[in-house]
Amino acid sequence: MVHVRYGGQNGEQYELAISENHIVVRTESRSSLISDRPFEAAPVSSQARNILNQFELSTRFSQAGVEVLHVKEPSQDGALRDTAREILNQEPEVQFAGRVLIDPVSQQPIVYTENLFVKFGHEEDVSFCQEILGRYGLTIKRQLEYARNAYFVSAPPNTGLAIFDIAERLLNEESVELCHPELVREFRQRQAFSQQWHLKETTIGGKTIKAHANVEAAWKLSDGTGTIIAIIDDGVDVDHEEFRSSGKIVAPRDVTRKTNFPTPGNRDNHGTACAGVACGNGNFGASGVAPGAKLMPIRFVSALGSQDEADSFVWAAQNGADVISCSWGPPDGTWWDDKDPLHKQKVPLPDSTRLAMDYAINKGRNGKGCVILFAAGNGNESVDNDGYASYEKVIAVAACNDFGTRSAYSDFGQAVWCAFPSNNGNPSQTPGIWTADRSGVVGYNSGSTNLGDQAGNYTNSFGGTSSACPGAAGVAALILSRNPNLRWDEVRDIIKRSCDRIDPVGGNYNAEGRSPFYGYGRINALKAVELALPAQPEPVSIFTAVQDVPINDLQTSQLSLAIANTNPIKSIKVTVDIEHTYIGDLIVSLNPPGECGVLPIILHDRKGGGADDIKQTYDEVSTPGLTALKGKIPQGTWTLEVADKAQADTGKIRSLTIELGF
């Protein structure tokens, strides 16, 4: 077993086994060693070919030129694996042949590279960081711009499994906050099975479909104009007639090839369909949910967990994306097979990707934050095992069908935030979602009216949570087009409040109105757009206390202010200005007057690691605990309490401001 730890020295540790029956290989020409067409296979000796005949292809990472091979007749001792490695490493055409890790639950292969993600504390200077990396023999490939003192580094060739020991030793360095090897897994898009009933009430084949998201009605108020939706996927046919309008395409990028041309590969149909669902113009054959939005196509076909993955979010944020749609994630289990081990595998979110998402959320839209959505998944399994879709700062989108109930494959769990219409398989009233397809007969539709249109420019059978996610992303764009001043979490809250509670019997909604299958329900686009504009302004009073109160190690400091108003509270915002050199040491609480009968409300709970200072406004969306103060009389003494829970760093409370609406 080897171990990897995400979240720093105190983060969760994940165990990975060394496979006895897999090898990973890369050829000099990037050609495959195993092919259905022998003349296309990489040239190797007869001895190597004989050993390869005992293996079969497990998975291929095409862009890296790497493939994972599996022994046809598995053993327990790894003898054939080791013999194959020895023979193949002597072949001139073979760049390397190495061991492979497997997830002990799902038995899925995981490839480790000789690269590491390393993040030092905020206070360390560059020369010190470089000195530490040099001490471990590491070469800096890139200093990462999305997190302070973060590096993508490589170990010397043939480091092999020792890369895990290096990562653990680095984590024991006092100056290192985060460190993990670059682990890559099979990357799967969120698609399942095979006219735009999801946008409005529609009659198809004599059947009236009413299971829509009320999108067409929302267009009277907003069509997405002024917003940009980033589609991170396998590329987009940017020459498609529904994307050809002037200025439609913004900042295209291929993070895998490192070019600005996100052209799909020969079999890459997924991204074009997703883009069509989100923001197709609707001028020729299919409208997106937000037809007025601009499209930022980002092609990402590298492996799950790679540095390219993190780069996708940074590119989107730096180039003006408002909304980021991700219809991909870890491999799903077979939705109808409850014995599939993939159902139980837990795939963590790498720190490198998490920090890139945080960068988009904290820095995107001039600090208001990009809205990030993920497809919940198509395995009929728990989304909570998927570290990507279950990350607390993203919106996980489930799928509901044309009957207004759960799509059979759709993942479920506590992380599901909302649902959007998609296909179902059987039974179904429609083939699926009608959307843009790669132009001509090269996409999902080979040129048949049974599959879409005769020209092959549109498909009628897109589906899965792959389709639900960009649909919800389009609604987020409608919201921001109506009110561009909203923060990312306010958009998420509006989506929550807009949802229609479908399937009341089968939805298993709890007391808070949340379902494991639909989250808060099926998005209602019209309601969401109506909620985007604030209600009529209410009388507001602002109360401020300014005083430099020292924050000493392992002590608690307080700053108080008195409020005399006796009107019931309708809304509240709390702004704090705290200077400190390591905010991960701090717990910050607001203590209302005792007469309110409300317990202290935690505003900040040791998050942020070694970052400096807390200058932030908290409201009922970002801090739901503040809702307990609605209807209370504010008269009395309010106290900001700051508890320092670790040694070495100090600071001071500068000010406290409380804004009350009456």
Curated annotation (Swiss-Prot):
It holds the Pfam family P_proprotein. PROSITE patterns: P_HOMO_B (PS51829), SUBTILASE (PS51892), SUBTILASE_ASP (PS00136), SUBTILASE_HIS (PS00137), SUBTILASE_SER (PS00138). CDD domains: Peptidases_S8_15. One of its GO terms (cellular component) is cytoplasm. It is found in: Cytoplasm. GO terms for biological process: protein processing. The active site is at D233 (charge relay system), H270 (charge relay system), S466 (charge relay system). Keywords: Calcium, Cytoplasm, Hydrolase, Protease, Serine protease, Zymogen. Residues 535-662 form the P/Homo B domain. Transmembrane segments: none annotated. Residues 196-529 form the Peptidase S8 domain. Degrades phycobiliproteins in vitro. Has a substrate specificity similar to that of trypsin. Belongs to the peptidase S8 family. This is Calcium-dependent protease. It comes from Nostoc sp. (strain PCC 7120 / SAG 25.82 / UTEX 2576). The lineage of its organism: Bacteria, Bacillati, Cyanobacteriota, Cyanophyceae, Nostocales.
